[in-house]
Swiss-Prot record:
Role of this protein: One of the primary rRNA binding proteins. Required for association of the 30S and 50S subunits to form the 70S ribosome, for tRNA binding and peptide bond formation. It has been suggested to have peptidyltransferase activity; this is somewhat controversial. Makes several contacts with the 16S rRNA in the 70S ribosome.
Signal sequence coordinates: none
Name of the protein: Large ribosomal subunit protein uL2
Organism: Persephonella marina (strain DSM 14350 / EX-H1)
Family that this chain belongs to: Belongs to the universal ribosomal protein uL2 family.
This protein's UniProt keywords: Ribonucleoprotein, Ribosomal protein, RNA-binding, rRNA-binding
Protein's GO biological process: cytoplasmic translation
A UniProt-annotated Pfam family: Ribosomal_L2
Length: 274
């Protein structure tokens, strides 16, 4: 598991740092756990762009991931570690004792042949999933639920982990990767360990074409546009002479965009840093 730096044979390989895929043990996905993934190219049902810089890219199959970890008390053996084009992390294929197969996000240190289990009585071991009330203070966790039974929503990207800091009545204090300290209900599930592939932050694609293979389109500067397309557009020179804003006029570069009096404010003990 790691990265490889390409030799500067061409301009496209000069600065490229890519995965070596040494952690992958199985190339083809489990057919029963995949489904077609239709391309949206960042458009909604009206055909309008709702997410910029998306489009094209290689065809993908969606891998159905078990974010809920709701199969309590049934041990599962790690059968393979696979590539997933739909996320930065790798995924692990589990074979349960009753014959069922499921994918989970691959945590650092989990190997083929290891056994994992979910439930309140599970051991505090990498890959095991438990309610937050059963996980000791100081433990690093990932794939954290915000609502009991809804499935993990937080800390799912490569190399990420959160830490349990303490308990407060029916809630558990968790420090998230952003630095935010948040209260999460003690019945919410989380998986022990850190998401694998911490080297993801070292990756350099090296050329525009490699970004296009991933479905990432160019990011055009507002100052390079016409006035009809962006508040920074137009003019003879390079400067736009006003406070920087988004294409929709929202102030940017340090401006706080979270709306006030939000329901979840009472669960946030400390906001994330810059």
């Amino acid at each position: 598991m790691g990265v490889r730096k390409l030799k500067p044979v061409t301009n496209g390989t000069r600065h490229a740092i890519l995965y070596d895929f040494s952690e992958i043990t199985k190339k083809e996905p489990e057919k029963s756990l995949t489904e077609p993934l239709k391309k949206k190219a960042g458009r909604n049902n009206q055909g309008r762009i709702t997410v910029r810089h998306k489009g094209g890219g290689h065809k993908r199959l969606y891998r159905i991931i078990d974010f809920k970890r709701d199969k309590w008390g049934v041990p599962a053996k790690v059968a393979a570690i696979e590539y997933d084009p739909n996320r930065s992390a790798r995924i692990a294929l589990l074979h349960y004792a009753d014959g069922e197969k499921r994918y989970i996000i691959w945590p650092e240190g989990l190997k083929v042949g290891d056994t994992v289990v979910a439930g309140p009585d599970a051991e505090i071991k990498v890959g095991n999933a438990l309610p937050l009330e059963n996980i000791p203070v100081g433990t690093f966790i990932h794939n954290i639920e915000l609502t009991p039974g809804k499935g993990g929503q937080l800390v799912r990207a490569a190399g990420m982990s959160a830490q349990i800091l303490g308990r407060q009545g029916d809630y558990v204090q968790v420090r998230l990767p952003s630095g935010e300290i948040r209260l999460i209900h003690k019945k919410c599930m989380a998986t022990v360990g850190t998401v694998g592939l911490a080297e993801h932050e070292l990756i350099k694609l090296g050329k525009a074409g490699r970004a296009r293979w991933l479905g990432i389109r160019p990011t055009v500067r507002g100052t390079a546009m016409n006035p009809v397309d962006h508040p920074h557009g137009g003019g003879e020179g390079k400067t736009f002479g006003k406070h920087p804003v988004s294409p929709w006029g929202q102030p940017t570069k340090g401006y706080k965009t979270r709306r006030g009096a939000k329901y979840s404010d009472k669960f946030i003990i400390k906001r994330r840093g810059k």
